[in-house]
């Protein structure tokens, strides 16, 4: 008998077949750099910076920017942001810089130039007659890169959210060490003409390069990062959620994974911790691999590890976290089963803590405490078994152990307890649910059972 086949009849004829479907529709690409070359892009001929500044500023005032010219200017303007490297900077075997080296954002990447001239048109009224200062260049760079952040804000954020962000960004680039170069609200007006610029590979690359630089190098103009910070861990919402989750429940990654009682986690965990990736190395190219063009399809997105993502946010919902209640459910990744496991894990880690004395008046008190704890441990090991085995969980110090939690789930037939359902309904019903969010899922699924 072939375990992969099913047998049935069609018009009295016996049919035997394997029901096969595409399980994983995405081809994930890991961002490892194997040729020891820095990430690179090719742009047009390097411009005269003074001429380029005047042209780009003119375009901003007219809400008419040429993306090729903007990218060419942003790459050339990197020379204004020199800083000292605090330590040897190595990523994927590439020596980016040595400690004490003077570097600019250009040091992180390889920007190649052709002989193709830019347009550098003047479209926005009167031409600036004098040459711009460095603070003016810094302000223009900051405003241009902020177009990336604004274009990444999704339509789910309703009301004046995007306008408020744009206003706050403009305020930053109107005050020292920056200088006001455009009228207020110009950024939002310009953004409407560049709403999809986050999809332009070269613009995305430059935003990621600036962000990687300013996230490590202390600099007078580090606030430029306000527009580029969204390039860090871009398309890594699954990995970022897992990192936040283990901090939230105060466990290591290894300890947390012992609670993941479902076969569908296996492939996702293998994918998330693929050997050779610099997931745990600060200031690595890994952090900006999407913007730097090192991967076409992220293996770390919420869709790539959907079961992990769903579980984490069901636990977050149980704990009443707004971020989890607002997150979007991955509908194809067993949300009903993940909500059950999330209820049990939420119960374990919500409103409970593991506490012990760690600080003492003097060394004598410390020694007395340690001796008393040792005696307790020895007594526990010599237990005569008078506690009913069914109640062992409630008397053992290991009630939070993966084994104890798994046993409770199995004893309840893999179903949520009424207390879990009441908690889910309580947190979700008091929250204004967004479409397809975890709050909406919990409301629709469990409100009738409460």
Swiss-Prot record:
Main function:
Encapsidates the genome in a ratio of one protein N per nine ribonucleotides, protecting it from nucleases. If expressed without protein P it binds non-specifically RNA and therefore can bind it's own mRNA. Interaction with protein P abolishes any non-specific RNA binding, and prevents phosphorylation. The soluble N-P complex encapsidates specifically the genomic RNA, with protein N protecting the genome like a pearl necklace. The encapsidated genomic RNA is termed the nucleocapsid (NC) and serves as template for viral transcription and replication.
Q: Organism source for this protein?
A: Rabies virus (strain silver-haired bat-associated) (RABV)
Report whether Phosphoprotein shows up as a keyword of the record: yes
Task: Classify the source by domain of life.
Answer: Viruses
Carrying Phosphoserine, the residues are 389
For this UniProt record, the keywords arranged alphabetically read as follows: Capsid protein, Helical capsid protein, Host cytoplasm, Phosphoprotein, Ribonucleoprotein, RNA-binding, Superantigen, Viral nucleoprotein, Virion
PTM annotation, UniProt: Phosphorylated by host CK2. Unphosphorylated protein N seems to have a better affinity for leader viral promoter encapsidation. Phosphorylation of protein N in ribonucleocapsid may stabilize the interaction with protein P, thereby playing an important role in viral transcription/replication.
User: What is said about its interaction partners and assembly?
Assistant: Homomultimerizes to form the nucleocapsid. Binds to viral genomic RNA. In nucleocapsid, binds protein P and thereby positions the polymerase on the template. Protein P acts as a chaperone on free protein N to prevent it from aggregation before encapsidating genomic RNA.
Among Gene3D superfamilies, the record links this protein to: Nucleoprotein, Rhabdovirus nucleocapsid protein like domain
- Keyword RNA-binding listed? The answer is yes
Question: What family does this belong to?
Answer: Belongs to the lyssavirus nucleocapsid protein family.
User: Any remaining note in the record?
Assistant: Displays a superantigen activity in human and mouse, activating mostly V-beta-8 subtypes of T-cell receptor.
Protein name (database record) = Nucleoprotein
InterPro entries, per this entry?
Answer: Rhabdo_ncapsid, Rhabdovirus_ncapsid_C, Rhabdovirus_ncapsid_N, Rhabdovirus_nucleoprotein-like
- GO MF terms, alphabetically ordered: RNA binding
Membrane spanning segments where? none
Q: What is its main location?
A: virion
């Amino acid at each position: 008998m072939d375990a992969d086949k099913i047998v049935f009849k069609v018009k009295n004829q016996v049919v035997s077949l394997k029901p096969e479907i595409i399980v994983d529709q995405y081809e994930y690409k890991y961002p490892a750099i194997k040729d020891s070359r820095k990430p690179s892009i090719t742009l047009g001929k390097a411009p005269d910076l003074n001429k380029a500044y005047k042209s780009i500023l003119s375009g901003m005032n007219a809400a008419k920017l040429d993306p090729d010219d903007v990218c060419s200017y942003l790459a050339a303007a990197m020379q204004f942001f020199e800083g000292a490297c605090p330590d040897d900077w190595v990523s994927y075997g590439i020596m980016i810089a040595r400690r004490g080296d003077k570097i600019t954002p250009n040091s992180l990447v390889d920007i190649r130039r052709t002989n193709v001239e830019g347009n550098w048109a003047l479209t926005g009224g009167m031409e600036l007659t004098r040459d711009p200062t460095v603070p003016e260049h810094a302000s223009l760079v900051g405003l241009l890169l902020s177009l990336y952040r604004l274009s990444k804000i999704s339509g789910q954020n309703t009301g004046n959210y995007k306008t408020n962000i744009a206003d706050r960004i403009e305020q930053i680039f109107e005050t020292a060490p920056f200088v006001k170069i455009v009228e207020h609200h110009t950024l939002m007006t310009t953004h409407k003409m560049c709403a999809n610029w986050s999809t332009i590979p070269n613009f995305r690359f430059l935003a990621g390069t600036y962000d990687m630089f300013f996230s490590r190098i202390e600099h007078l103009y580090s606030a430029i990062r306000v527009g580029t910070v969204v390039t860090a861990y871009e398309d890594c919402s699954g990995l970022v959620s897992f990192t936040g989750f283990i901090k939230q429940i105060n466990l290591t990654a290894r300890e947390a994974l012992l609670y993941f009682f479902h076969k569908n986690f296996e492939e996702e965990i293998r994918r998330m911790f693929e050997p050779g990736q610099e997931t745990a190395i600060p200031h690595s190219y890994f952090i900006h691999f999407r913007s730097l063009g090192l991967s076409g399809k992220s293996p770390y997105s919420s869709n790539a590890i959907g079961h992990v993502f769903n579980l984490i946010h069901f636990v977050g919902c149980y704990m009443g976290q707004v971020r989890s209640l607002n997150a979007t459910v991955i509908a194809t990744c067993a949300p009903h089963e993940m909500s059950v496991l999330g209820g049990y894990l939420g119960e374990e880690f919500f409103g409970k803590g593991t506490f012990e004395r760690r600080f003492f008046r003097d060394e004598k008190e410390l020694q007395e405490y340690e001796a008393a704890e040792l005696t307790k441990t020895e007594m526990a090991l010599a237990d005569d078994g008078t506690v009913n085995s069914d109640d062992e969980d409630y008397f053992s110090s290991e009630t939070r152990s993966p084994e104890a939690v798994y046993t409770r789930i199995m004893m309840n037939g893999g179903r949520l307890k009424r207390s879990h359902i009441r908690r889910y309904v309580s947190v979700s019903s008091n929250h204004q649910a967004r479409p397809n969010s975890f709050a909406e899922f919990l409301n629709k699924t469990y409100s009738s059972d409460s």
